[in-house]
Regions:
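Active-site mouth of glycoside hydrolases
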Residues: 36-39, 43-307
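Bacterial N-terminal signal peptides that target proteins for export
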Residues: 2-19
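Catalytic-core region of carbohydrate-active enzymes that cleave or remodel glycosidic bonds
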Residues: 302-373
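N-terminal signal peptide c-region/cleavage motif recognized by signal peptidases
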Residues: 24-25
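Short, hydrophobic beta-strand segments that form beta-sheet elements in well-ordered domains
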Residues: 287-293, 310-314, 331-332, 436-437
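Aromatic- and carboxylate-lined catalytic core of secreted/periplasmic carbohydrate-active enzymes
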Residues: 346-472, 483-498
Length: 498
């Protein structure tokens, strides 16, 4: 560990001068990025990719009791290609949000933060207080080991630097709480932690220092992108919209669409600028994600961090992708939940979102817990779902999308002229291929604006990916009629020119 001489700003300079040559991972291929031919999808290791996963509650590194190798083995086995991770600037108490077994709530004295422990007792979660002028080598080693192991297994990692505080229980455990660090940095209100102009400039310098430190140390990983903050609207929001106008209490969750306040957006822009500034002196450039709102909202420039290539919604509706297509960024559904625990609920959400043009889907999977890192704790009480069966069903979506030339696929709402009894979402590579998701009462007969020629159509089970029906089509003029097989609730359809 390296002792800093004065401010947190010096942290970045000192660590940059002394540690970068030792701790950086070996340089690999270019990091995951927006696809150069279609910025609404991603490109990784030379291929267009959609990130689709059902992953744990972001505590794999900060919770040292969690066996992350077993966890990554389960993700790889189930065909998941992505996981989300909190950097350790936020931790939860046991029982938070009604989660019985929470990977983001480590046992007492076990919280592994990015800062070193001091020699002074008194951290509210057990053990010594944090020294915000020193970074923890144990944390950094575990973080790098996790990202490297994920990369070997073909899994992309989203690292979220900061998180809203939500309430006094979380604040009691927060490393930035003056009672939990030896610097005793004064914080007038935890709600102002992630806002500009900074009400606590010293603390803002520590936030910048952590950001720059992790950006430097992780620069060599290709399976990594950064997210500035989780759910910034939770602590600082403006009312954006509501979902159902017929509810009497339309301005409460889960009907209210809360968007991030301008003061919080300004803070996120400052953190994003620190990321790009730091990487401007380093070999690699990593994508930045911005978490903007829950549910759905049409965004404008004032809502956005200019450096962000990925825009995240939580509990998202398909309209989140549809309404923001013109931004030319990847639109992600970054967290599910609060809709029960049935697999079919989150399977439907995933299909509807990605088939509306969303490039990323992350089901928050509560079946991953300490001791059940294989994702089999389906009895865990939590505000969401997750199971091995759901992960297999989500793999079917990825397999379906990646059978096409993904970078050429675009939402095509006019391709389906008529769809009795069902709702259809279509992605098209015009003149070459069409991918459809059909949900509703089957069987049905679709009327399609299919170009003249010979085509192969395959109706595919959304549960396990097997082909329900295959036929050759000779299209003479549009619209062409195509009859489905019997199906229960939903079916996928691939149409490819012969």
């Amino acid at each position: 560990m390296i002792r800093l001489k004065s401010s947190a700003l010096q942290t970045t300079r000192l660590l940059g001068a002394t540690c970068i040559c030792v701790l950086l991972p070996p340089l690999t291929a270019a990091p995951i990025r927006q696809h150069p031919d279609n910025p609404r999808w991603l490109e990784w290791r030379g291929k267009a990719v959609a990130l689709i996963t059902s992953a744990e509650h972001y505590g794999t590194v900060l919770n040292p009791d969690f066996d992350f190798r077993r966890y990554l083995e389960a993700l790889q086995r189930d065909g998941m290609n992505y996981t989300r991770l909190f950097a350790g600037s936020y931790v939860e108490p046991q029982g938070a949000f009604g989660i019985e077994r929470n990977t983001l709530a480590p046992a007492r004295r076990k919280f592994l933060a990015p800062w070193a422990r001091s020699d002074q007792p008194g951290y509210a979660g057990g053990g010594n207080k944090f020294d915000l002028d020193r970074f923890s080598p144990e944390y950094l080693a575990r973080l790098k080991e996790f990202i490297a192991e994920a990369g070997r297994r073909g899994i992309v990692v989203e690292l979220t630097f900061f998180c809203s505080t939500y309430g006094d229980q979380q604040w009691a455990l927060h490393p930035f709480n003056s009672t939990n660090n030896i610097q005793a940095v004064a914080v007038p209100s935890w709600k102002s932690l992630h806002t500009l102009p900074a009400r606590q400039p010293v603390l803002f310098n520590y936030q910048l220092a952590l950001t720059r430190h992790l950006v430097r140390e992780l620069n060599g990983f290709d399976n990594l992108f950064f997210e500035v903050q989780n759910e910034p609207w939770a602590d600082n929001h403006a009312m954006g919209d509501f979902i159902n106008p017929y509810l009497s209490d339309k301005y409460s969750f889960p009907n209210a669409v809360e968007v991030t306040s301008p003061e919080s957006v300004a803070w996120q822009r400052a953190i994003a600028k620190a990321i790009t500034d730091e990487e401007g002196r380093l070999p690699q450039r990593h994508l930045i994600a911005q978490n903007v709102a829950n549910f759905r909202f049409s965004l404008n420039d004032g809502d956005l961090v200019p450096e962000a290539g990925i825009i995240h919604f939580h509990y998202a509706y398909p309209e989140a992708a549809e309404w923001n297509r013109g931004l030319n960024r990847v639109i992600g559904y970054d967290e599910t939940g609060f809709a029960g625990n049935k697999d079919e609920t989150y399977r439907r959400q995933a299909w509807n979102f990605v088939m509306s043009g969303g490039g990323l889907f992350n089901n928050l999977d509560y079946s991953f817990t300490t001791g059940h890192e294989d994702g089999t704790d389906t009895a865990n009480k939590a505000p969401g779902g997750g199971s091995p069966a759901l992960r297999r069903q989500l793999k079917t979506i990825g397999d379906f999308l990646h059978r096409f030339d993904l970078a050429r696929l675009q939402p095509d709402p006019l391709f389906v002229a008529r769809a009795p009894g069902v709702v259809v979402r279509a992605l098209s590579h015009p003149g070459k291929a069409h991918a459809l998701y059909v949900q509703g009462r089957g069987p049905t007969t679709l009327s399609l604006q299919l170009a003249k020629g010979r085509w192969t159509a395959e109706w595919i089970s959304v549960e396990d990916g097997h082909v329900l029906k295959r036929e050759n089509i000779s299209a003479e003029k549009a619209p062409a009629a195509l009859a489905s097989p019997e199906f229960n609730d939903a079916v996928a359809l691939s149409i490819v020119r012969q």
